């Protein structure tokens, strides 16, 4: 558990939170795929003596574009507790709106990641997309590593049989009432059950 955990609402970080290990994603309903990512980040934290930060978005971009309700698996307070348990030092909870959605993938890398965050390592999953019209991906991030001084870390996805463990997979199983599978995939099963009850 981390002491002095900090929550930012924009990318203006304090000096001590720059040049950190950065994880980018929604991290909705912490599952075992997320846990694999956090475990890897924790090993980097110990090895390189760096802080861990998470960049996440509110609302989840898919909720914003498709005007979805009752989509989240975790509320904000639940996310914070799960981050703290995984030795995250700070988060950037960026408001996702029309203005932010118009930022190009190149501007996101240069003006936000490079100019403001200055990460040493960026942890992302295979399906990560960013920038206007989701034009940016992990391939683009990797191609600009040397230009902007970061290193992309992309752990292989965790699978259950042929399925990648993801928030989408958990949602589908919740909708079908497959609670045994939800419990198997999820790190935050208690949170999910409590939150699911509140949704209906």
Describe every region a protein language model picked out.
Residues 147-158:
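A short, charged helix-loop
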Residues 63-126, 130-148:
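N-terminal Rossmann-like or analogous alpha/beta NTP/dinucleotide-binding catalytic cores
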Residues 4-11:
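Short acidic-hydrophobic, aromatic-tinged amphipathic segments that line or gate anion-handling sites
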């Amino acid at each position: 558990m981390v002491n002095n955990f900090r929550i930012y609402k924009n990318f203006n970080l304090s000096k001590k939170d720059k040049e950190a290990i950065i994880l980018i994603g929604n991290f909705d309903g912490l599952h075992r795929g997320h846990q694999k990512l956090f475990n890897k980040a924790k090993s980097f934290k110990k090895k390189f003596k760096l802080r861990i930060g998470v960049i996440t978005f509110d609302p989840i971009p898919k909720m914003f574009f498709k005007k979805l309700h009752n989509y989240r698996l975790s509320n904000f307070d639940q996310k914070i507790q799960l981050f703290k348990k995984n030795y995250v030092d700070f988060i950037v909870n960026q408001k996702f709106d029309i203005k932010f959605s118009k930022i190009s993938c190149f501007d996101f890398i240069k003006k936000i990641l490079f100019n403001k965050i200055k990460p040493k390592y960026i942890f992302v999953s295979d399906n990560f997309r960013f920038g206007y019209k989701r034009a940016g991906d992990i391939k683009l991030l990797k191609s600009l590593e040397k230009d902007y001084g970061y290193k992309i870390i992309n752990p292989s996805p965790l699978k259950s049989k042929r399925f990648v463990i993801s928030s989408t997979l958990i949602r589908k199983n919740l909708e079908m009432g497959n609670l045994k599978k939800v419990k198997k995939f999820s790190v935050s099963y208690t949170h999910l059950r409590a939150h699911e009850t509140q949704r209906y």
